[in-house]
């Protein structure tokens, strides 16, 4: 509601000066109290108040220190006095709103604000968490929780952004808890699953431990103290608490409050309702005057002037309806006047309607409660002391009640009787009885009676009343002590005896009993009643009358002091016997008539006070004190003549200042009590909604610009209201838009747009760690609303995106600048060594990644609301990395040639970028690749050359000794070194084997050179793999090159091993003394390892998967076949040597004849060793020991089996061929014995070594077995001594040779 004197009115078109009361002295700027140190600065200098002082520009700052500069002392004192007067006047209006609200209520659905944290509490929290991390608390926790707390402590609690947020008052304990909860949710999700323990349980446990650390041990013992006013401000406040709050807000002293409280009669609801009626009547009159004189505020269209008057009338009518809807009494279903709810109240709601609602006598029927308490009877002498007496009581027209019985010697009761009546002047009868003792007596005997005529003004205390006794009674002085208490209904505003004379009613001057009845909030009636009557004898509605004190009227007998009620065409004269009674009647009727004129009794008449002198003296005392303190002008000031737009601006500002300095993290939201008072003030005093929200926006923006945390949702509400109003959407039903409102709205819109853009540019610092929750998302939403041209047309997303993109570009510069300042990177870049520069850039990269991860974690909330937000955040990150590029390139350019220390930087950055879908292969990522492609290629080239050289030199010096522990025997080959990061790079380990090396040597006894080769190839491939090169083509090229390199290197290794194997075997002898040397087994194992490693090192994923792998596989397989063949050939040559020796015993040879003769001759005298047994035994030992050597030292079972298969088969073939050459000859006994033993032992030994039955029992073996069996049979017949137990038959008793 825009008051005629509001700030929307231009000074040159305002109402005349005499129509308003002036609060501001001429030439003095309107200013707020000194407590509001920012008021003058916040008010727009162009604000024009439609009254005196309203158009004066306000000073830059009202603080005394600033004001005192260039101002003399009298001017300064005048300003301070003016501020005090403004505060007091405001407080008068505020306490009236609190005392009798009829428009607003304290909202109960507002979100409860959390207690804010201060710097001392933050420091205490840091100490508590540090104590936990140092193990100084009793809280038991696992390592994972400790790591989470350590991260929270280092990243969050120690952050300067958190310190600033706490200092601004926008941080609560709940914010700290939510940040910790968000951190641990991510950690717990990454933990492995544990049977029987859900992750929700872990989360709950961690939160409970966090709460225990947060509270601290000493806080558990503290008892809560009494809550202060600041602490209960979030609750629904009582009137006393609201008074106290606004005393603090407006700087009002207790004494000033008490004086105003008494003077305003804040505890008198009738006076407050009457004050409201007077205010509303004054506003209607002012609206009519404005319409008549055609003096309006400037509106954006001429048609709005008439609409403005209608809005003023409608707003007052609404307030009247609100007031009318309030019940007259607090309750009581017996009150029958509620039917006049004024559905037909057009008489007083609509201007110009002279029709009145005529009340009937039945409309003003009252209801009273009477309490009659009978205490005792005195002077009872006519009956015996032991007789029973009792009393009855009745209100005429109602039921009778009786007391208990008592003895005549002690007639005391203390009995109370409760009655209800509708008679304002009831008749109460109390009778005293004694029980009749006569047999025929039908009724008890009446001893006395008393008839009383109480009123609501009668004494409530017990009094003695003389009783009327029957004739001839001895009780001449019979008295009864009783109390009659008659209540005063809430709608009965005053009552008593008055003389009256009127033209239409009470046409005869006489004394009557009058009652002032309030039928509804706007309908009062003056009624005269007779005894025992419910309806008034006569009544007069007070609507339209004006009451005032008058001088005595000559000729009217009765009454000492006079007053009258005057209305056009009617005058009613009243008279009272008592001055104080007259004052009370005039005050009551003054409230009822709603007149603006306040009656003041004549000075001389105040001296006439035959009764109630003490009451008048008290009133005079209050008036004197009030006058002494200069309060009268504030009470008597007409609200409709003051600039409430200006006053409300000060009130709202002071309230917001107080709110932001209380103990709650309010973010700019008022407390329920403050909202209630501001709502009530605006409704009651006609503050336009747009003006209220424009002022609120100004204040909130001012605080936000000064570092306070303000909820953007709050800004959005007020801005949306103002935008809707300015564009004619009538959010509060007001269709008029003033020029000033539109201009101020445009100014605020531009200022708000700049503020929001600045906040988005500083989002890491305005919304640290995503606090307040949802604030960034709300800010983006508000910015979108602010950028709209009007309220109906949505702005294209591209335009919003363009603005936000510009903000995020600034944000990238701001964030990176602050990060480099924190890391002090510029000093390092200017002076440090290349290694130090690289170290600093690596640290800076870690900080950059941390910043962007925090952005994603805490500021990605716009993702749900704005589809373009992730893209812009990615562009922001690219800008951020572009700034980092300058420092990175500087550091890399300073590195010496062929220095690989920069690879960890690539791995760090690449691992972050490749996992971000929006940054992967982005501008910075590609720049990073362009820098490191030559380094990677150069590194691989040098590694290839170094490995090739190590193979060449290694095989030249190779001893082929098996390597048991690679860490102790690898040669120290000079290779390009890469510092280790979390990744394994191709370096020679210094006497400690990496964990992944275990598979290379646990079952491997390869050579030093081969093991070194395989380790280097694997490490190089792991290094390149761990680079996770993002560009597929180059990554495939690297992989292909490394696979080809591995294939070539392994091929060279295999060929060198094959050559060395052949040379080694050539040097070995062919006798049964041959034992396979360890070097041969090592060579064998090298081929085995090459086979295994080729699968991993030479296999490609993709179309060429088999290209290198199959080639090297074929080479290895063929080489293995060759060396098996060479080894078998060597073993067979030993067997051939044995058979060659046996050939000397062939039948018909000279040596055979001599040998047979000598053996036979010698056998007669000595125990001659069995010829041929030494030869068989040495061969069998040769086979067995070489089998054991191969089985022990060659690691591949498959190759061993192949070797044994071929060895067995070839051995059997050689023996079979040897026998085939002697088909026509009978074997010598020694030949036969030796062969049988060799064949049988060979068969059994190879069967034990796992040679399969099919191979063992081949055709060759069958042929051999049959031949030897036949030879054995022939020998047993021809030789007398036989074969001495040697036979081809299987036998367990057979001698083991």
Curated annotation (Swiss-Prot):
Taxonomic source organism: Mus musculus (Mouse)
Quaternary structure (record): Homodimer. Interacts with the dopamine receptor DRD2.
Keyword Protein transport: yes
Comment block on domains: The PH domain is essential for regulated exocytosis and binds phospholipids.
GO cellular component: centrosome; ciliary basal body; cilium; cytoplasmic vesicle; cytoplasmic vesicle membrane; glutamatergic synapse; nucleoplasm; parallel fiber to Purkinje cell synapse
Source organism phylogeny: Eukaryota, Metazoa, Chordata, Craniata, Vertebrata
Residue span, C2 domain: 353-468
Annotated protein name in UniProt: Calcium-dependent secretion activator 2
Tissue specificity as recorded in UniProt: Highly expressed in cerebellum. Also expressed in non-neuronal tissues such as lung, spleen, testis, uterus and ovary. Highly expressed in brain. In brain, it is highly expressed in cerebellum, cortex, olfactory bulb, CA1/CA2 regions of the hippocampus, and dentate gyrus, and weakly or not expressed in the CA3 regions of the hippocampus, striatum, thalamus, superior and inferior colliculi, and brain stem. Not present in adult adrenal glands. Isoform 4, but not isoform 3, is highly expressed in postnatal and adult stages of cerebellum.
Keyword Protein transport: yes
Protein purpose: Calcium-binding protein involved in exocytosis of vesicles filled with neurotransmitters and neuropeptides. Probably acts upstream of fusion in the biogenesis or maintenance of mature secretory vesicles. Regulates neurotrophin release from granule cells leading to regulate cell differentiation and survival during cerebellar development. May specifically mediate the Ca(2+)-dependent exocytosis of large dense-core vesicles (DCVs) and other dense-core vesicles.
Xref: SMART domains: DUF1041 (SM01145), PH (SM00233)
Bias-annotated ranges (Gly residues): 47-56
Keywords noted in UniProt: Calcium, Cell projection, Cytoplasm, Cytoplasmic vesicle, Cytoskeleton, Exocytosis, Lipid-binding, Membrane, Metal-binding, Phosphoprotein, Protein transport, Synapse, Transport
């Amino acid at each position: 509601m825009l008051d005629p004197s509001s700030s929307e009115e231009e000074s040159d078109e305002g109402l005349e000066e005499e129509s308003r009361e002036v609060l501001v002295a001429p030439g003095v700027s309107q200013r707020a109290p000194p407590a509001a140190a920012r008021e003058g600065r916040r008010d727009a200098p162009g604000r024009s108040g439609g009254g005196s002082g309203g158009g004066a520009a306000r000073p830059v700052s009202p603080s005394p220190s600033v004001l005192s500069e260039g101002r003399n002392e009298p001017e300064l004192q005048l300003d301070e006095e003016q501020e005090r007067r403004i505060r007091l006047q405001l407080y008068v209006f505020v306490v009236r709103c609190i005392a009798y609200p009829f428009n607003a209520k304290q909202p109960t659905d507002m979100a409860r604000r959390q207690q804010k944290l201060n710097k001392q509490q933050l420091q205490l929290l840091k100490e508590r968490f540090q104590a936990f991390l140092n193990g100084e608390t009793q809280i038991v926790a696992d390592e994972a929780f400790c790591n989470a707390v350590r991260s929270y402590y280092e990243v969050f609690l120690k952050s300067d952004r958190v310190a600033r947020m706490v200092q601004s008052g926008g941080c609560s304990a709940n914010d700290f808890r939510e940040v910790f909860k968000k951190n641990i949710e991510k950690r717990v999700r990454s933990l492995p699953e544990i049977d029987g323990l859900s992750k929700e349980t872990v989360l709950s446990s961690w939160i409970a431990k966090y709460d225990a650390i947060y509270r601290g041990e000493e806080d558990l013992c503290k008892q809560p103290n009494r809550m202060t006013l600041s602490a209960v401000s979030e609750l629904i406040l009582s009137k006393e608490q609201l008074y106290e709050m606004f005393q603090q807000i407006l700087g009002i002293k207790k004494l000033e409050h008490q004086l105003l409280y008494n003077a305003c009669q804040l505890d008198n609801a009738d006076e407050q309702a009457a004050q409201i009626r007077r205010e509303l009547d004054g506003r209607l009159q002012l609206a009519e005057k404005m319409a008549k004189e055609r003096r309006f505020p400037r509106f954006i269209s001429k048609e709005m002037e008439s609409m403005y008057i209608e809005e003023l009338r409608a707003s007052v009518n609404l307030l009247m309806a609100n007031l009318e809807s309030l019940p007259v009494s607090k309750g009581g279903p017996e009150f029958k006047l509620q039917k006049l709810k004024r559905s037909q109240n057009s008489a007083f709601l609509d201007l110009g309607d002279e029709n009145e609602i005529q009340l009937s006598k039945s409309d003003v029927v009252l209801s009273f409660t009477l309490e009659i308490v009978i205490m005792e009877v005195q002077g009872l002498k006519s009956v015996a002391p032991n007789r029973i007496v009792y009393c009855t009581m009745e209100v005429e027209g109602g039921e009778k009640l009786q007391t208990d019985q008592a003895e005549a010697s002690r007639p005391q009761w203390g009995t109370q009787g409760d009655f209800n009546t509708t008679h304002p002047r009831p008749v109460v009868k109390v009778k005293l009885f004694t029980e009749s003792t006569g047999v025929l007596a039908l009724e008890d005997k009446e001893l006395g009676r008393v008839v009383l005529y109480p009123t609501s003004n009668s004494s409530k205390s017990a009094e003695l009343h003389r009783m009327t006794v029957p004739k001839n009674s001895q009780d001449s002085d019979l008295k009864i002590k009783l109390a009659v208490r008659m209540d005063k209904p809430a709608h009965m505003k005053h009552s008593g005896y008055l003389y009256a004379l009127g033209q239409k009613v009470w046409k005869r001057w006489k004394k009557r009993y009058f009652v002032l009845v309030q039928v509804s909030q706007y309908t009062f009636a003056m009624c005269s009643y007779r005894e025992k009557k419910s309806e008034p004898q006569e009544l007069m509605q007070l609507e339209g009358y004006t009451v005032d004190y008058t001088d005595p009227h000559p000729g009217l007998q009765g009454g000492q002091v006079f007053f009258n009620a005057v209305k056009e065409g009617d005058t009613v004269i009243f008279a009272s016997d008592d001055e104080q009674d007259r004052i009370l009647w005039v005050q009551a009727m003054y409230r009822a008539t709603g007149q603006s004129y306040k009656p003041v009794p004549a000075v001389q008449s105040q001296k006439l006070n035959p009764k109630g002198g003490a009451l008048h003296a008290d009133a005079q005392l209050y008036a004197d004190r009030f006058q002494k303190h200069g309060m009268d002008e504030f009470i008597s000031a007409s609200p409709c003549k003051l600039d409430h737009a200006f006053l409300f601006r000060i009130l709202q500002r002071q309230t917001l200042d107080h709110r932001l300095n209380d103990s709650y993290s309010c973010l700019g939201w008022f407390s329920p009590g403050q909202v209630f008072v501001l709502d009530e003030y605006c409704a009651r005093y006609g503050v336009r909604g747009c003006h209220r929200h424009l002022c609120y926006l100004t204040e909130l923006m001012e605080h936000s610009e000064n570092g306070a945390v303000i909820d953007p949702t709050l800004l959005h509400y007020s801005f949306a209201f103002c935008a809707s109003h300015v564009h004619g959407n009538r959010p509060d039903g007001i269709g008029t838009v003033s020029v000033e409102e539109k201009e101020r709205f445009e100014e605020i819109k531009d200022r708000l747009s700049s503020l929001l853009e600045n906040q988005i540019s500083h989002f890491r610092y305005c919304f640290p760690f995503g606090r307040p929750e949802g604030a960034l998302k709300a800010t983006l939403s508000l910015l979108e609303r602010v950028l709209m041209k009007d309220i109906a047309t949505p702005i294209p997303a591209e335009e919003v995106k363009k603005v936000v993109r510009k903000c995020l570009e600034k944000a990238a510069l701001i964030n990176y600048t602050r990060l480099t300042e924190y890391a002090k990177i510029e000093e390092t870049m200017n002076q440090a060594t290349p290694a130090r520069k690289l170290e600093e850039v690596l640290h800076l990269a870690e900080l950059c990644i941390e910043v962007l991860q925090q952005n994603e974690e805490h500021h990605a909330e716009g993702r749900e609301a704005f589809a373009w937000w992730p893209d812009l955040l990615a562009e922001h990150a690219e800008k951020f990395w572009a700034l980092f590029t300058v420092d990175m390139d500087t550091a890399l350019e300073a590195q010496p040639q062929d220095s690989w220390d920069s690879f960890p930087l690539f791995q760090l950055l690449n691992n972050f970028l490749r996992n971000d879908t929006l940054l992967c292969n982005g501008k910075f990522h590609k720049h990073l690749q362009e820098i490191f492609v030559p380094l990677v290629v150069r590194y691989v080239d040098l590694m290839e050359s170094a490995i090739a050289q190590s193979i060449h030199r290694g095989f030249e010096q190779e001893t082929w000794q098996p390597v048991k522990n690679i860490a102790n025997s690898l040669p120290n080959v000079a290779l390009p070194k890469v510092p280790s990061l979390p990744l394994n790079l191709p370096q020679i380990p210094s006497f400690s084997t990496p964990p992944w090396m275990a598979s290379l040597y646990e079952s491997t006894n390869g050579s030093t050179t081969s093991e070194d080769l395989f380790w280097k190839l694997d490490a190089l491939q792991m290094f390149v793999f761990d680079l996770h090169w993002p560009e597929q083509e180059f990554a495939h090229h690297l992989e292909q090159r490394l696979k080809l390199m591995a294939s070539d290197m392994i091929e060279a290794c295999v060929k060198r091993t094959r050559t060395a194997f052949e040379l080694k075997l050539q040097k070995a002898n062919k006798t049964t003394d041959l034992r396979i040397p360890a070097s041969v087994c090592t060579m064998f194992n090298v081929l085995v390892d090459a086979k295994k490693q080729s699968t991993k090192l030479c296999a490609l994923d993709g179309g060429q998967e088999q290209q290198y792998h199959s080639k090297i596989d074929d080479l290895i397989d063929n080489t293995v076949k060759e060396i098996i063949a060479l080894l078998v050939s060597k073993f067979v040559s030993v067997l051939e040597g044995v058979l060659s020796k046996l050939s000397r015993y062939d039948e018909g040879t000279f040596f055979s004849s001599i040998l047979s003769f000598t053996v036979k001759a010698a056998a007669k005298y000595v125990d001659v060793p069995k010829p041929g047994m030494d030869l068989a035994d040495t061969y069998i030992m040769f086979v067995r020991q070489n089998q054991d050597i191969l089985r022990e030292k060659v690691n591949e079972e498959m190759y061993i089996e192949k070797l044994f298969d071929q060895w067995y088969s070839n051995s059997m073939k050689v023996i079979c061929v040897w026998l085939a050459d002697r088909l026509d000859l009978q074997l010598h006994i020694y030949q036969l014995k030796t062969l049988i033993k060799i064949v049988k032992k060979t068969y059994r030994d190879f069967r034990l070594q796992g040679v399969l039955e099919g191979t063992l029992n081949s055709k060759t073996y069958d042929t051999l077995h049959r031949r030897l069996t036949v030879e054995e049979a022939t020998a047993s017949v021809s030789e007398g001594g036989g074969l001495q137990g040697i036979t081809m038959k299987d036998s367990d008793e057979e001698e083991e040779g």
